[in-house]
Curated annotation (Swiss-Prot):
It comes from Caenorhabditis elegans. Residues 1-10, 68-82, 148-177, 260-276 are extracellular. It is found in: Membrane. PANTHER family: SERPENTINE RECEPTOR CLASS XA 10, SERPENTINE RECEPTOR, CLASS XA-RELATED. Belongs to the nematode receptor-like protein srxa family. This is Serpentine receptor class XA 10. The lineage of its organism: Eukaryota, Metazoa, Ecdysozoa, Nematoda, Chromadorea. Residues 32-46, 104-126, 199-238, 298-319 are cytoplasmic. InterPro entries: 7TM_GPCR_serpentine_rcpt_Srxa. It is a multi-pass membrane protein. The chain crosses the membrane at residues 11-31, 47-67, 83-103, 127-147, 178-198, 239-259, 277-297. GO terms for cellular component: membrane.
């Protein structure tokens, strides 16, 4: 039986719309939940960066991919000519921001593996500083082509980003398009190495070799109170898992981009409805990585989020902790 591409396109669009609304709500409420949380062990700065950029990505995605679907060709042309290039910059910026933040998270993990003292270089204020650096670089790489004659403008009717000086493109656009696809793969590779290192730490031989390289640098942490050291290691493990899942998820998405780049006829031979269906299904998975990482794979943030939604959104009383009553028993002995 032949599959109707138009029906598949409508299903794909519905899936993308549903994922967009759900993840916009989740990212906003997650940010509020983390802000009101008293858990100081959370990597809050990374969570804010991922959640806020993801919420903005959803908003720009609605403007670029969803609203034009319901417009007439004439209305869409006016819409695209007026703000199309601007919102194309917005959607690209917020798509690249989690990738760059992932690179920072990976560097953080590697630095702590090399030396626990490196955690001093990744305090909350310093992470905000580092993210502001890559945000500035990201914005510069997008605004320079935008101000040139080769600015990029997404066209939903052609299902692609179109250069206004086509077939040419700005050198920065060409460079970023070629290399940005490898960001999640590189991060995934190094996060796998970090996980291997984490598993090898159970080996006494590996620990001895590692301590030889850290000789003279471990006094600060061996003298730490055990509860502080335990909390620090718990935070590091949480970050490792989050970085790995994020890298894996984004790598899966970028893998399809790499395949389409190597074999472009796979996409080019599809009908317009087929191209839109494929695009909407791909887009639907992009905003889900925050929910996947911080709700599915991170029990701590999941509990914080559920408590926040229960109390602040549904105005329910906080869940009571179960207490076990111990009754005192007396024994009598016969004399």
């Amino acid at each position: 039986m032949d599959v109707d591409a138009a029906v598949v396109k409508r299903i794909a669009l519905w899936v993308y719309e549903t994922c967009s609304v759900f993840n916009l709500f989740y990212c906003i409420t997650l940010s509020l939940a983390i802000k009101t949380s008293k858990n100081n062990a959370l990597p809050a700065t990374y969570i804010y960066n991922m959640a806020i950029s993801n919420a903005l990505l959803v908003i720009f995605g609605i403007m670029v991919y969803i609203l034009p679907y319901y417009m007439s060709d004439k209305t869409y042309k006016t819409y695209r000519d007026s703000i199309g290039a601007m919102i194309s910059v917005g959607v690209t910026f917020n798509y690249l921001h989690p990738m760059l933040t992932l690179i920072l998270m990976t560097i953080n993990r590697i630095a702590v593996v090399v030396s626990m003292q490196a955690s001093q270089l990744f305090t909350s204020s310093k992470i905000w500083l580092y993210t502001s650096f890559h945000m500035t670089a990201n914005f510069a790489c997008l605004i320079i082509p935008y101000l040139s004659e080769c600015r990029i403008n997404y066209d939903i009717r052609k299902v692609g980003f179109i250069s206004e000086c086509a077939p040419d493109r700005h050198q920065i656009t060409t460079f970023s398009n070629y290399y940005s696809v490898f960001f999640p793969f590189v991060a995934f590779f190094f996060n796998v190495l970090v996980i291997i290192n984490f598993k090898l730490q159970r080996s006494p031989t590996y620990t001895k070799i590692k301590n030889m390289f850290r000789r003279g640098n471990g006094d600060q942490f061996t003298s730490m109170p055990s509860d502080v050291l335990k909390a620090k290691k718990k935070t590091e493990r949480m970050l490792m898992i989050q970085a790995f899942i994020t890298a894996f998820y984004l790598s899966v998405y970028e893998l399809t981009s790499l395949v389409l780049r190597v074999v472009p006829e796979l996409f080019g031979n599809l009908s317009l409805d087929g191209k839109l269906a494929f695009t909407y299904f791909r887009l639907a998975q992009v905003p889900c990585h925050v929910f996947l990482v911080y709700f599915i794979f991170t029990p701590v943030t999941r509990k914080i989020y559920m408590d926040f939604v229960r109390e602040r959104v549904f105005c329910m009383k906080p869940a009571k902790k179960k207490t076990i009553k111990v009754s005192a028993t007396t024994t009598s002995t016969k004399k």
